[in-house]
Amino acid sequence: MSVPPAVPLLEVRDVTKSFGNVAAVQGVSFPLYGGEAHALVGENGAGKSTIVKMLAGVHGPDTGSLLVGGEEVSLGSPSDAKARGIAVIYQEPTLFPDLTIAENIFIGTQPRARLGMIDRSAMNTAARALFDRLGVPMDPDRLASGLSIADQQLVEIAKALSTDANVIVMDEPTAALSGNEVERLFKVARSLCASGSAVMFISHRFEEIFALCQRVTVMRDGRHISTSELAGLTVDDLVRSMVGRDLGALFPKIDVEPGAVVLEIENLSRAGVFSDISFQVRAGEIVALSGLVGAGRSEVMQSAFGVDPRDSGDVRVRGKSLRKGSPKAAMRAGMALVPEDRRQQGLILDMSIERNATLTRSSALARFGFLFGGRERRSAYEWTKKLQTKYARITDPVGVLSGGNQQKVVLAKWMATAPSVLIVDEPTRGIDVGTKAEVHRIISTLASEGVAVVMISSELPEVLGMADRVLVMREGRIVSELSRSEADEEKIMFAATGSEAAA
């Protein structure tokens, strides 16, 4: 790595921030150098979001200082941060949908023609120049409504460049992106670094951190643990720094001899979505559905569970066919579905933790048609305790929990039904590494107890670390089946993309 310049573009120096009696950040320091991508990592609650809000001008530090180009500055508002060349790109951008791309980029700074009118021609020309600089084609006259998350993020980056930002903070930007969209974003980030900007990258995905970044800062419990070059570090090194202990294994897979066939899917088809899907899952087996976004993985299992329709095919649990289009029939047969979007599909965010954890057993817990709080609370306590769910009060709204603890509540809800088939769709998306290991442990333990598990995952390390078999889907069809010993990243990606025949 080349030697960075002596003066960083931005430096966080010994900052502290508390909210009431809770210290969110304590004595954190790190530099951001021009020409580098710098990862900021830590478990949920480590203080990363507070640091981002400091840099964005939302919160000021209680003590310590922020320096831009070696000069101490006060970022009392987002406009102060913008004036100092700092821009934050969030996971879910907030563009104005009824304005054009160019209007979103230059809102508040539109070029003016004579008589003070907005010069739309000049604005569109300037927007095109920004996208040319980023190396991405985009029509500046298009409305922002309907843009993908990936394209919205590029508009936000173009907006940052339009204000001469040279410190770009990317806060979990890849969580909702496909593989191709991630690579395009990385290409843009690398071009920003090549032009002398500093990029701060926040992500739970280690493969992305190692692919993009040159330096990493680790936080734990609001404190600075280390800042170092990534070269020579391993994922295990980062995990140990982040969680303060050796996780033993991020993928604590328990080897189990599979039992009898529990789930059978035969010739399942839905026009335009998936076709002729057939596979079996045995007791104690974890079968992963892998493939690119849009391959039809989630749709197949939602159809099998009865949430989505199917045109033809059969779904059997322990040899008994299920009535199609009936989640109730699937549940009675012993199936459970942990959906991809836990906030929209798996939880009722305004409802309490205890009520969410017992939703699947409301009828069983009721007496004479009424649900009494004591029985509900005991059941919720039992399952949230088993899953080591962290919360202040079990009566709190589930929406206040971290992503990892929300996922545990969804799992608790289904584990309380004693399922024989568990479908988990992107089970660790958006949760920190320590909680990922806990979720993996839960899934592995369930399999060891005889549950047949179908895991849909876009994270290849998770697929390879947890699955006994891997079924690869492409364009709505299963194109490859790989045993645990056969599967590797190359074979899965070749099959998923159709670029080469997989074994």
From Swiss-Prot:
Domain of life: Bacteria
Keywords: ATP-binding, Cell membrane, Membrane, Nucleotide-binding, Repeat, Sugar transport, Translocase, Transport
InterPro entries xrefs: AAA+_ATPase, ABC_carbohydrate_import_ATPase, ABC_transporter-like_ATP-bd, ABC_transporter-like_CS, P-loop_NTPase
Annotated membrane topology: Peripheral membrane protein
CDD domains registered for this protein in UniProt: ABC_Carb_Monos_I, ABC_Carb_Monos_II
EC numbers for this chain: 7.5.2.7
Entry keyword Mitochondrion: no
Binding site for ATP: G42, E43, N44, G45, A46, G47, K48, S49
Catalytic activity as recorded in UniProt: D-ribose(out) + ATP + H2O = D-ribose(in) + ADP + phosphate + H(+)
Subcellular location: Cell membrane
Signal peptide range in chain numbering: none
Disulfide bonds: none
Keyword ATP-binding (UniProt): yes
Residue ranges of domain ABC transporter in the record: 10-246, 256-500
GO cellular component, one term: plasma membrane
GO function term, MF aspect, one: ATP binding
One Pfam family recorded for the sequence: ABC_tran
Purpose: Part of the ABC transporter complex RbsABC involved in ribose import. Responsible for energy coupling to the transport system.
Family label: Belongs to the ABC transporter superfamily. Ribose importer (TC 3.A.1.2.1) family.
Subunit-level organization: The complex is composed of an ATP-binding protein (RbsA), two transmembrane proteins (RbsC) and a solute-binding protein (RbsB).
Name of this protein: Ribose import ATP-binding protein RbsA
Source organism per UniProt: Rhodococcus jostii (strain RHA1)
Gene: rbsA
